[in-house]
Amino acid sequence: MPGNSGNDRSVVVGRVSGAFGVRGWVKAVSFTDPPVNLVGYRPWTLRRGDAERRADVLEGREHGNAVIVRLQGVDTREQAEALKGFEVTVRRSQLPPPAPGEYYRVDLVGLKVVNLGETVLGEVVDVMETGANDVLVVQGDRERLLPFVQGVFVKSVNLEESRIVVDWDPGF
């Protein structure tokens, strides 16, 4: 499949931040909007470094700025604490399709970036969140940081062609 929108890719959607209570519930920071959507993605793959394990979500709910979740086979506080720091990943195919003109960051990584004059600036290696707008980290002959502002700097995104066209001077 062209581009990086393959449905077999893992996407980080949260992180286990610790235990909740004494019965094995875990507390997780959700990167989804709204945060409780994290509970609906099943199964999870928990990953920390080279360690990886499947986690079946039995139930969960929002709790303050986080979510609390009961996972199959995690029955004690000690078992839940052992999962602290694990990333929560799901398959890309589990995510709902983005609205028109919106993109998942994971789908932008790997796309070729060219300017209006067809000069290749490089490839998107990361997307940083800065508050005001996301920033594309583009690696070519050097690293460039390009604001992801559609209609201003970003003129088009074509996932099928693995290409982003930007209004950007290659000297910058």
UniProtKB/Swiss-Prot annotation:
Name the GO cellular-component terms: cytoplasm; ribosome
Q: Is Cytoplasm given among the entry's keywords?
A: yes
Q: Name one GO molecular function term.
A: ribosome binding
Where is each PRC barrel domain found? 100-172
**Location in the cell:** Cytoplasm
Q: Source organism's superkingdom? A: Bacteria
Q: Where is the signal peptide?
A: none
Alphabetical keyword list: Chaperone, Cytoplasm, Ribosome biogenesis, rRNA processing
For this chain, the family text in UniProt reads: Belongs to the RimM family.
Record note on domains: The PRC barrel domain binds ribosomal protein uS19.
* Name of this chain's protein: Ribosome maturation factor RimM
Organism name: Methylococcus capsulatus (strain ATCC 33009 / NCIMB 11132 / Bath)
Gene name, per UniProt, is: rimM
